[in-house]
Every structure is written in C-alpha cells, then in structure tokens.
C-alpha cells in the first residue's frame, strides 16, 4: 500500500501530470512523469497515481492490477525526487502480466525518462 502522503488524490494533479508530463509507453503500462520545479509541499515527497480503466477487465481484475502496480510503485518511491508526480496507466495486457514484469516495465520507463522532465 502506498503511504497517504505519496498518493495522488486530486483530479487536477492527474490532469496536470498527464497533460504536461513526459510520456513513456511499454507493452502493459503507460507512464507519465512530471517533475515540478516548485512543488506545493516539498516534505510530502513524490506522488503516484494509478489509472486502471474498464478495458483492463472486470472489477476484480482491475483491482488486482491496481494492487500490483501500487506494490511496484511503493518499491520505487526512494528513486523518485520529492517533486515528482507519476501517473501509471494500466493497459489491457497488464491483466495477465506478473508483478515482476510490471516492475521491470516501470523501471525501464523511469530510466528512459529525460532528466529535466516537466515544464
């Protein structure tokens, strides 16, 4: 489970990250990363949001994918800057992907992101 301070909860945060952040795609996920130059609250740390749409599958399957992605994202919190905003969008293939594969894809996306990501 992601700590509350690291969860993206407002739709405005999601929208800004998806609209102004850098996008990187993998077979099972799409990652949007936005690095704020002046974050609202520096002590809060990085924030992560998940988007798991109905195309992924039934409610049970979507929740299973969301739990896996939360677990993977929590392990990577230490590698993110405090000002980072990260949105992970699950694609239909994520339903059958293992947690290890999702972790590998997320790490690959973060490694490939340019250094000065964001506005």
Swiss-Prot record:
Family to which the UniProt record says this protein belongs: Belongs to the RnpA family.
Top EC class, one word: hydrolase
Reactions catalysed, as given in the entry: Endonucleolytic cleavage of RNA, removing 5'-extranucleotides from tRNA precursor
Function: RNaseP catalyzes the removal of the 5'-leader sequence from pre-tRNA to produce the mature 5'-terminus. It can also cleave other RNA substrates such as 4.5S RNA. The protein component plays an auxiliary but essential role in vivo by binding to the 5'-leader sequence and broadening the substrate specificity of the ribozyme.
Gene Ontology MF terms in the entry: 3'-tRNA processing endoribonuclease activity; ribonuclease P activity; tRNA binding
EC number: 3.1.26.5
PROSITE patterns: RIBONUCLEASE_P (PS00648)
GO aspect biological process, one term: tRNA 5'-leader removal
Subunit structure, interactors included: Consists of a catalytic RNA component (M1 or rnpB) and a protein subunit.
Classification via NCBIfam families: rnpA (TIGR00188)
Entry-linked SUPFAM superfamilies: Ribosomal protein S5 domain 2-like (SSF54211)
InterPro entries, per the entry: Ribosomal_Su5_D2-typ_SF (IPR020568), Ribsml_uS5_D2-typ_fold_subgr (IPR014721), RNase_P (IPR000100), RNase_P_CS (IPR020539)
One Gene Ontology cellular component annotation held by this UniProt entry: ribonuclease P complex
Organism of this sequence: Mycobacterium avium (strain 104)
Keyword vocabulary terms for this entry: Endonuclease, Hydrolase, Nuclease, RNA-binding, tRNA processing
Name recorded for this polypeptide: Ribonuclease P protein component
């Amino acid at each position: 489970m992601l700590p509350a301070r690291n969860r993206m909860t407002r739709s405005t945060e999601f929208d800004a990250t998806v609209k102004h952040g850098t996008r990187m795609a993998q077979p099972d996920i799409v990652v949007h990363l936005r690095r704020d130059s002046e974050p609202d609250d520096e002590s809060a740390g990085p924030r992560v949001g998940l988007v798991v749409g109905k195309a992924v599958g039934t409610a049970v399957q979507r929740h299973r994918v969301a739990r896996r992605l939360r677990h993977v994202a929590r392990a990577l919190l230490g590698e993110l800057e405090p000002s980072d905003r990260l949105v992970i969008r699950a694609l239909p293939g994520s339903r059958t992907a293992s947690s290890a594969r999702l972790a590998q894809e997320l790490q690959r996306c973060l490694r490939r992101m340019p250094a000065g990501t964001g506005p």
